[in-house]
Amino acid sequence: MGKLTLLLVVLLGWLQYSLWVGKNGVHDYMRVKQDVATQQANNAKLKSRNDQLFAEIDDLNGGQEAIEERARNELGMIKPGETFYRLVPDQNKRRTVGTASQSVASYPSVTASH
């Protein structure tokens, strides 16, 4: 009985060592699990970006409105005879301190170009 017990204890020790420290043990499993989670998060971000790009491509292929909007926003273009107004936040915002009847007032400046 002593030899069988010793053999089982040694086998149990070897299995525990393999589980915790050995190749493909718990540490490797946790590292790979973290790597998979990181890659899945990265894939989700890239999929979202791809979906946005495909939607933008569809808009650009669909008509002139998307192209016109892009020209206005990114290139600052306007149509002939059109007046462009840009609202600029006021740098001198008035801040009031006191009663609840007083309010914060800030009025945007307006600039126009032809």
From Swiss-Prot:
Residues 31-62 form a coiled coil. The chain crosses the membrane at residues 4-21. This is Cell division protein FtsB. One of its GO terms (cellular component) is cell division site. The gene is ftsB. Residues 1-3 are cytoplasmic. PANTHER family: CELL DIVISION PROTEIN FTSB (PTHR37485:SF1). Its main location: membrane. Belongs to the FtsB family. The keyword Cell wall biogenesis/degradation does not apply. One of its GO terms (biological process) is FtsZ-dependent cytokinesis. The keyword Ubl conjugation does not apply. InterPro entries: Cell_div_FtsB (IPR023081), FtsL/DivIC (IPR007060). It is a single-pass type II membrane protein. Gene3D superfamilies: 1.20.5.400. Part of a complex composed of FtsB, FtsL and FtsQ. It is found in: Cell inner membrane. Essential cell division protein. May link together the upstream cell division proteins, which are predominantly cytoplasmic, with the downstream cell division proteins, which are predominantly periplasmic. Keywords: Cell cycle, Cell division, Cell inner membrane, Cell membrane, Coiled coil, Membrane, Transmembrane, Transmembrane helix. Residues 22-114 are periplasmic.
